[in-house]
A protein has these predicted regions:
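Cysteine endopeptidase catalytic domains of the caspase/legumain-like
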Residues: 1-264
Length: 264
């Protein structure tokens, strides 16, 4: 059995005035953890992560995997939405990831990722971890780890990268989400928040990180070796949402996939 991972972190968004701070650290942290778990890891940071290179790298990873192999893709950066042109979205919007060159209009839509994921061979396990996007509000959890003066939302409004003609079919009143990512064809999606919420870019002990990534890694260290993804998700829920980090992590996938051992 082969285990492979791609960890993407984008802080720098030229032409948008919407740079982030914690995404490269997120990707580095996921990379270190996955390497410890026996994964061969490729990293893509900032200018390395254009739409073309992301599509190529994800396609190569999925295409090389065989029955029994495990694939993990982590993405930390901005999320966004674009008007749905295929009619498969009830809310009229396709969700998307924001590559480094999003300022040139190069959004990576969920429909495009779906086509890549459909190429996977039977028996390949795929996990997507997305620390990006959304908006919303709820109060509970523990803020003790969070530095003062933070955080910043990981959502890039379509008006930043698309012109009026591209946006005309959909309303600008709502923020982007990743609910449709549950249809990508992977076994599991672990996301930083609900479709109606933001994921937050913040700082812990002076070091920038995504809130979801920080607490996901923190809680994983406290779980036993036989813990499942469902166990992990419940542990993360003890920390998020909070008053200052109003994001509700999500896990999407089949019952059996939720009970897979973590990163096995």
């Amino acid at each position: 059995m082969s285990k492979s991972a791609l960890c993407i972190g984008i802080n720098d968004y030229p032409g948008t005035d919407s740079d982030l701070a914690g995404c490269v650290n997120d990707a580095s942290d996921w990379s270190a953890l996955l390497a410890q778990r026996g994964y061969g890891v490729r990293q893509m940071f900032d200018s390395e992560a254009t739409k073309a290179t992301m599509v190529q790298a994800i396609g190569d990873l999925i295409g090389a995997a065989r029955n029994g192999d495990s694939v993990v893709i982590t993405y930390s950066g901005h999320g966004t939405w674009a008007p749905d042109t295929s009619g498969d979205e009830p809310d009229g919007r396709d969700e998307g990831l924001c590559p480094y060159d999003i300022g040139d209009g190069n959004v990576l839509l969920d429909d495009e990722l779906t086509e890549i994921f459909r190429l996977r061979e039977a028996g390949v396990r795929v996990l997507l971890i997305a620390d990006s996007c959304h908006s919303g509000s709820v109060t509970r959890g523990d803020d003790a780890d969070l530095d003062p003066g933070m955080p910043r939302a990981r959502f890039l409004p379509p008006s930043v990268w698309a012109d009026d003609t591209q946006l005309a079919p959909a309303s600008l009143s709502r923020n982007g989400g990743f609910g449709s990512f549950s249809r990508l064809g992977g076994d599991l999606l672990m996301a930083g928040c609900r479709d109606t919420e933001f994921s937050w870019d913040t700082r812990f002990g002076g070091r920038p990180n995504g809130a979801f990534t920080y607490y996901a890694l923190k809680t994983l260290q406290q779980l036993g070796p036989d813990a499942s993804y469902q166990d992990w998700f419940r542990a993360i829920g003890n920390h998020l949402p909070t008053t200052r980090l109003p994001q509700t992590p999500q896990i999407l996938g089949s019952r059996s996939a939720r009970h897979f051992p973590i990163f096995e």
